[in-house]
Amino acid sequence: MIESLEVSIWGRSFTLPVEYDCYEGEEVTKAQIRAIKNFQAHIKWIEQSKSIVENYCREQVMSDKENAKKDNIFSYIKPECLFVKRDKENPRIAMMCKYRYDLEHGLAVVFSSDGKVTVGIQDIIL
């Protein structure tokens, strides 16, 4: 089982803990292990997600008069961990982030096994 992963996210290196969606006492499933290995094999998905995340955040970022670094994605997003959903049919990994404009719900960048990227509040994967 992978407990942390070193990844380059939009030009910066991070070591992110990997959290698995499991009930108490339940073991990580084979599908979850396959999902994280598939994600490792397609790390380029992270770089490709940057424009999707920027588009999702654009309105809030542009209306923020206090943020002088609007062109720096890390001025409003901080990757915190990778979350591996327990789902045999559609294995997904989410990069869970702190989000300056929604501290309560944060932001999730969800990667499906087919490379599809979805962005939204963390509730979209939890």
Write out the residue ranges for each language-model feature:
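Acidic, proline/glycine-rich low-complexity IDRs
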Residues: 1-13, 17, 72, 76-126
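Long, contiguous N-terminal structural blocks used for assembly/anchoring
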Residues: 1-70
